[in-house]
């Protein structure tokens, strides 16, 4: 599941990526490592399905000049550990990642930890919550993060 998600992001298959999330799924990138709550707190990302769709529409629009030329991403996901499973088959999965982004003739590297709460459904798992903790969250960036890592 996690490897497929990384491939979907790298290939910019946004409809497939959104389909990995449950109807009330959340993508969360906290601004602090010890942050326990995302709702109502400062975050890099705290996005539900509606906000994710809005970001895709904005960044893929033909006149999204801030995204020209389009970036290229390459994810590596490793150290996948199933932390827990409940009686319903829902699981919490921890993993590590490295993402290289090539954009405007430069490469930016992002590394960190994922924590997924995956809800079991009749047709597979869906993301209820994806938490992405960046190792280099305090690093200086010439431009903001436009896409999910």
Which residues are covered by each model-predicted region?
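Short, aromatic-enriched amphipathic alpha-helices that serve as compact interaction elements
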Residues: 1-10
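Short, well-ordered alpha-helical segments enriched in acidic and aromatic residues
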Residues: 12-28
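A solvent-exposed, acidic/Ser-Thr-rich amphipathic alpha-helical stretch
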Residues: 23-94
